[in-house]
Amino acid sequence: MLSLDLMSHTLDAELSTKARILVVEDEAVIRDMIVMGLEEEGYEVFFADNGRTGLNMLQNPEFNAPDMPLDLVILDIMLPEVNGLDLCRFLRYQGNTIPILVLSAKASETDRVLGLEVGADDYLTKPFSLRELVARCRALLRRQQFIRSTPKNSVRQFKDISLFPEECRVTVRGEEVSLSPKEYRLLELFMSYPRRVWSRDQLIEQVWGADFLGDTKTVDVHIRWLREKLELDPSQPEYLITVRGFGYRFG
């Protein structure tokens, strides 16, 4: 049996030989440091020096094709033409679930929370060490590989709700409903483990990530939004049940 250290080393080696990373950073010194550091780790790295070029690269099917997609975006917030927050927000609005690591010189809790709330998966404050950036990239890539390796060819059905993982699509009583990326991830997690009770902290870790710095009440807000879209009577929920003193369960 492989030891945990050997398994981790093997997984990191597999990630480095396969992962394709886009770096969108306008400061040449920082961009070159990131690109060179990631290439030394074995990743295939591409870069853009403004938000518009980065967006065009992400939307170019010849560059970001379904059979050879980008695996991670490292995105500065203060970018010319299209800023990082708007780019992140646009990608999530389009249903793009690629992991996004945001870089910023803004270190306040408000700025970090804003970056995560618009769809970033992680937030790293400048100045940072290359070692920490690489470690965060590995963590995001491991999570992405796990998601991709999870069988997604079966439709998940619970009473009147159907979730189609390959299409990131949900129908309720036969009608398609529009969910934000976080709402979709919450519902997918709940439907993967029906009747399991999840605490707010567990939901934060699974959906927002362990580095989330906001209030756990954001879970309650997203649950309320989901109930409004799923339940016949949100005040008497049939699907998303509050388990007082513990958290929430589905069904």
UniProtKB/Swiss-Prot annotation:
PROSITE patterns for the chain: OMPR_PHOB (PS51755), RESPONSE_REGULATORY (PS50110)
GO process annotations (BP): regulation of DNA-templated transcription
Disulphide bonds in the chain: none
Response regulatory domain segment(s): 20-141
Gene3D superfamilies named in the record: 3.40.50.2300, 6.10.250.690, Winged helix-like DNA-binding domain superfamily/Winged helix DNA-binding domain (1.10.10.10)
DNA-binding region per Swiss-Prot/TrEMBL record: 153-251
Keywords per UniProt: DNA-binding, Phosphoprotein, Two-component regulatory system
Pfam family, one: Response_reg
UniProt keyword Thylakoid present: no
Post-translational modification: Phosphorylation.
InterPro entries: CheY-like_superfamily, OmpR/PhoB-type_DNA-bd, Sig_transdc_resp-reg_C-effctor, Sig_transdc_resp-reg_receiver, WalR-like, WH-like_DNA-bd_sf
Record's keyword annotation contains Nuclease: no
Residue positions where 4-aspartylphosphate is found in the record: D76
Cellular compartments per GO CC: cytosol; protein-DNA complex
GO MF assignments: phosphorelay response regulator activity; transcription cis-regulatory region binding
CDD domains: REC_OmpR, trans_reg_C
Protein name: Probable transcriptional regulatory protein SYNPCC7002_A0851
